[in-house]
């Protein structure tokens, strides 16, 4: 995964440095509101909560060019750590269900419209659309406290689309934006009885800050 991040960042940086009138954005963001899809396998109980166990974060690099007055178009790559859903406890059977950690590396097209106003603080609208390479840190775990056993179920988080839309402001090349984002995903489990695949999209509102370099 780290190799993918470094390769993507190196590629975008080279494109930015090789092109004239190019903008390079370096940003970091925090998920101030989060929601996972709730998984309910066939003939089974819910295995996760929609809330996250902690705040997610991301590190992003984007490169754009102005293709029309006030309109920028480009590409981006981001490392996004979503954490995992809060553990689900079944008090009737003294069982705890732990979901694996969920991370993504989306590669996407991005567009930014700078609203033309006579001010040092420049508002803008922004949208992203791309593909999310998703990864989970381990397997689904059923922890039976009564028996003192932990059962692991082989699991995988499949890739999917990524998109986001929002608005922000720019001041002296510093940028800050607030965006609604979704990473589409499927949660797949494998047992001796077969495989299951359920929607496991991650939705959130992300507050990002960063700096724009002009080349």
Regions found by a protein language model. Give the residues of each.
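Residues on the lipid-exposed face of transmembrane beta-strands in outer-membrane beta-barrel proteins
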Residues: 30, 57-65, 77-79, 107-113, ...
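Short glycine/proline- and aromatic-enriched beta-strand/turn motifs that initiate or cap beta-hairpins
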Residues: 18-65, 212-214
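Extracellular/periplasm-exposed beta-strand and loop segments of Gram-negative cell-envelope proteins
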Residues: 33-54, 78-106, 132-162, 181-204
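Residue-level detector of the transmembrane beta-barrel scaffold of outer-membrane proteins
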Residues: 23-27, 72-74, 122-126, 175-177, ...
């Amino acid at each position: 995964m780290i190799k993918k991040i470094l390769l993507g960042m190196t590629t975008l940086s080279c494109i930015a440095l090789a092109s004239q009138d190019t903008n390079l954005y370096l940003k970091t963001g925090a998920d101030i509101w989060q929601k996972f899809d709730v998984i309910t396998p066939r003939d089974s109980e819910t295995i996760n909560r929609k809330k996250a166990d902690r705040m997610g974060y991301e590190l992003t690099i984007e490169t754009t060019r102005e293709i029309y007055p006030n309109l920028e178009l480009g590409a981006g790559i981001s490392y996004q750590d979503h954490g995992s859903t809060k553990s689900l406890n079944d008090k009737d059977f003294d069982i705890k269900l732990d979901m694996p950690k969920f991370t993504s590396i989306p590669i996407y097209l991005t567009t930014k419209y700078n609203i033309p106003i006579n001010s040092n603080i420049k508002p803008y609208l922004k949208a992203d659309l791309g593909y999310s390479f998703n990864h989970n840190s381990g397997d689904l775990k059923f922890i039976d406290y009564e028996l003192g056993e932990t059962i692991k179920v082989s699991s995988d988080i499949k890739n999917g689309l990524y998109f986001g839309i929002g608005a922000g402001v720019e001041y002296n090349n510093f940028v800050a934006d607030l965006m609604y984002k979704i990473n589409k995903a499927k949660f797949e489990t494998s047992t001796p009885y077969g495989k299951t695949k359920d929607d496991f999209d991650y939705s959130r509102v992300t507050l990002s800050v960063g700096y724009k370099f002009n080349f």
